Design a protein with these regions (language model features):
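Noncatalytic alpha-helical scaffold of FAD-dependent oxidoreductases
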Residues: 2-546
């Protein structure tokens, strides 16, 4: 809690979220429940893609008719099953259609595969045996972690064998001096973070799906998340990887060294490769010390220019203690209040066009409180912000974060949502949202009684990552044609990237040319051909079809 002197300086300006104003905080907000296999069947059918039953929902192959099953891949045979049964326990093999349903479908119920077999190895050696056999016998494979992806990268397109890392969930070692953690790829991110918390450390990434996503999947998709501003991307925090190549070769590079200047840094090839070059089975990652002093403030501002001004000043005045700088617009918080907050509570006294959530973390509370106080006072004096609250305990800390983390779930409550994850230069960040609203409005598709209820923008100002969501009643070809490929053309025109942290999968692979040159795509194809000449690893994704 802020000291009495600090609190006195802030009274009448930024409100401390203490006992007197506790009712103003969204204490009744329902923190989004992490997805799990057990919860899959009860997750709202309206979420994201479809209100249809699984039997009526179209297969991914039908939704992407340009994709054709490769004739070079074999169909699964009894001989193949006999081999898998010879190396795996019966509980690690699933052929039951009902059991496979949760693994053939993504959690958004947008992508639906047709796999007849799921394998759940528990060791790297078993993964090696499986991939060698599949490569020798031309059986396509889809690696799957927690299945929390958003672009269809972790589910089959046709009848590929699903190789789940769920049984590979052991922590192998932790060095309390260096902070180097070595673990299996199937470890759940939140489990790792809780383990490190007991040691005084923290995972360098944090995601809304942390209760279900696997660290191997995080690495394979180069997941970003809420801590990237402070700790950087996985390209910097991953120290080493254990990867099984398509031919079964085990690439043992689980180094815990901070510095190793011998040869090519091969692990970087697999970070963000989405399971197309091999399967990550082990991860060595550098975990930073957990901060002893953490503050969270939610601020209301009147324009995106003021959001930028607040961010610039935070880099100048909060610098080394700044750990997150998130923004969301009024449409975002309105959806959260409508769908996730009991009693329509608002953390601030009135609505604002934009909101900023700032987190600081450090080792000296008095020092951090003083810096944050000076920063907030300056914003108020210069009329950069109009209102705000500062969390005073762990519950309020979580409640303020729950607003930001609840936006994706709230967007889905209208029936479905179109999701775009873009890297855009901050000065034109919000122009994308405004242009898309104008485009849909001109087409007569935007409004409570129209196809699209609202367009919302939120994301990570600190790394230029915009989450552009369209909350709609249902999927519509008319809406899709208005959004695509315009959203990618706009991004390319402003020197952005069509995928900031969600990856490419089956959804964005046809649009890769908006972010990468022909020569770069050709080099990617050559790398793919070199490491996976038979093309068995996660086919039909990542790279555009020729």
């Amino acid at each position: 809690m802020f000291s009495m002197a600090t609190a006195a300086r802030l009274q009448g300006h930024i409100r401390l979220a203490g006992a007197r104003s506790l009712q103003r905080l969204p204490s009744a907000i329902k923190t989004p429940t992490p997805l799990s296999r057990a919860a899959f069947a009860t997750f709202p059918k309206a979420a994201y893609a479809s209100t249809a039953s699984a039997e009526k929902r179209p297969f991914t192959a039908d939704k992407f008719p340009h994709l054709k099953r490769s004739e070079s891949f074999k169909k699964l045979s009894d001989k193949d099953l006999d081999f898998f049964k010879s190396i795996l326990a019966p509980s690690a093999i699933s052929q039951d259609e009902g059991d496979l349903e949760a693994f053939n479908n993504d959690w958004m119920q947008k992508y639906r595969g047709q796999s007849k077999l799921m394998l759940k190895p528990s060791t790297t050696e078993q993964v090696s045996q499986i991939l060698k056999y599949c490569n020798d016998n031309m059986l396509a494979v889809v690696p799957q972690g927690g299945n929390t992806g958003l672009v269809g990268g972790g589910v089959p397109v046709f009848d590929e064998i699903i190789l789940s890392t769920a049984n590979m969930n052991s922590i192998r070692s932790f060095d309390a001096l260096s902070g180097a953690l070595v673990c299996d790829a199937g470890c759940i991110l939140e489990v790792l973070d809780n383990y490190l918390a007991e040691q005084g450390y923290i995972m360098p990434l944090d995601l809304g799906a942390k209760g279900s996503c696997h660290i191997g999947g995080n690495v394979a998709t180069n997941a970003g998340g809420l801590r990237l501003l402070r700790y950087g991307s996985l390209h910097g925090t991953v120290l080493g990887l254990e990867v099984v190549l398509p031919d079964g070769t085990i690439l043992d590079n689980l180094s815990t060294l901070r510095k190793d200047n011998t040869g090519y840094d091969l692990k970087q090839l697999f970070i963000g490769s989405e399971g197309t070059l091999g399967i990550v089975t082990g991860v060595s990652i550098l975990s930073p010390k957990r901060s002893k002093a953490v503050n969270v403030a939610l601020l209301g501002v009147s324009s995106f220019e003021q959001v930028q001004a607040a961010y610039k000043r935070s880099r100048d005045e909060l610098s080394e203690i700044l750990s997150a700088f998130e923004f969301f617009d009024q449409a975002s918080i309105d959806l959260v209040k409508q769908h996730l907050v009991a009693g329509n509570n608002d953390p601030l006294e009135s609505s604002h066009p934009f909101y900023v959530l700032i987190e600081t973390s450090g080792s000296n509370k008095d020092h951090d409180d003083e810096k944050l106080t000076n920063y907030l006072e300056g914003l108020l004096t210069d009329e950069i912000v109009q209102d705000g609250v500062v969390a005073q305990d762990t519950t309020q800390f979580k409640n303020l974060w729950a607003i930001r983390e609840g936006i994706p779930e709230a967007c889905s409550k209208s029936g479905t949502v179109y999701k775009y994850d873009l890297s855009i230069p901050v000065p034109v960040f919000y122009q994308m949202v405004e242009d898309m609203r104008a485009r849909l409005d001109k087409a007569g598709l935007l409004g409570k009684d129209k196809e699209v209820d609202c367009v919302v923008g939120f994301g990570h100002i600190g790394d230029g990552n915009l989450h552009l969501n369209f909350a709609a009643k249902r999927y519509s070809e008319a809406v899709t044609n208005i959004i695509e490929p315009y959203v990618y053309e706009w991004t390319a025109k402003h020197a952005g990237s069509i995928s900031s942290e969600h990856g490419l999968g089956v959804f964005k692979s046809p649009y890769l040319h908006y972010s990468k040159s022909p020569s770069m795509i050709q080099l990617m194809r050559r790398i793919k051909t070199m490491l996976d000449p038979n093309g068995i690893m996660n086919p039909y994704k990542y790279l555009p079809e020729k």
